[in-house]
Design a protein with these regions (language model features):
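Membrane translocator/pore-forming domains, dominated by Gram-negative outer-membrane beta-barrels
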Residues: 4-261
Length: 261
């Protein structure tokens, strides 16, 4: 930061592919687009806002830990979110450190369909928050090692679902808390008037899920399970001009009955 007020506009397309075996067996493909704008107010504070759209396709086999359905089904979910984020940079014993926080809210629209043609739909209010902190170590001028710790929380309140045959599914308020500890290693390359960076970040993730589903004639069914997962993210960035920068990453989350690319 050179003392002048700086602004930044960014756009990020995204894709996730997940396979889950418990408590219900399903595959998911999620496409999304996020965009944001932030302002560097001074050397310590950056404030921004963002919007997000995601479209998820979830295919259920009908198999589960406690229940089995003769036919499978699918759920298509459209998610619309908006939020604020803030980054605080400081020094701790001569080392750079930062704290990143965000708040967001929005809604989800879900269309459900079984393989034998029964349909239903519902809407849900979604909100969440995230907090992450890191400390920067520089073993060399072009190498950075950054331990990080983060916590994320999401809460979704779906309306009662009623299908064409009169069956209902009433959701508790569904929530999930995620704790993550990781270490990011980054290498910087200088070329011309710009820089390119490559990084890898392995981490351990612990999730805590809450919320059941009450289905006509079946009673209460658990919706989310607690999981201990591993995660590896590989990515990089490159300066194209003094005003334009590109970045990309690929992540893989795994553990037990869960895999997400």
């Amino acid at each position: 930061w050179d003392g002048k007020k700086l602004s930044n506009l960014w756009v990020v397309p995204g894709y996730h592919s997940a396979k889950v075996d418990s408590p219900f067996e399903f595959d998911a493909d999620i496409y999304g687009l996020e965009a944001g704008y932030d302002v560097q107010l001074n050397p310590y504070h950056k404030l921004g806002l963002f919007v997000s759209y995601r479209q998820g396709e979830y295919d259920f086999s009908g198999k589960g830990d406690d229940y089995y359905a003769k036919t499978g089904g699918s759920i298509d979910i459209d998610s619309y979110l908006a939020g604020l984020y803030h980054r605080y940079d400081t020094q701790i014993k001569g080392r750079s450190a930062w704290l990143m926080s965000s708040l967001y809210g929005g809604w989800q629209k879900a269309d459900l369909k079984s393989d034998d043609g029964v349909k239903a739909d519902t809407d849900g209010l979604e909100y969440g928050a995230a907090l992450e902190a890191g400390v920067v170590f520089m073993p060399a001028t072009d190498v950075m090692v950054e331990p990080t710790v983060g916590v994320r929380y999401v809460h979704i309140d779906f309306d009662t679902v009623r299908d064409g045959l009169g069956k209902t599914a009433r959701y508790d308020d569904v929530s999930e808390t995620e704790l993550e500890f990781g270490v990011k290693a980054e290498k910087t390359f200088e070329y011309g008037d710009g820089y390119a960076k490559l990084f890898v970040k392995p981490s351990v993730v612990q999730t805590f899920g809450d919320g059941d589903v009450r289905i006509t004639s079946l009673g209460s069914v658990s919706g989310l399970e607690d999981m201990t997962l591993g995660r590896v993210i590989v990515g990089g960035s490159m300066d194209f001009t003094k005003q334009l920068n590109g970045f990309a990453d690929v992540g893989y989350t795994f553990g037990g009955d869960y895999r997400d690319l």
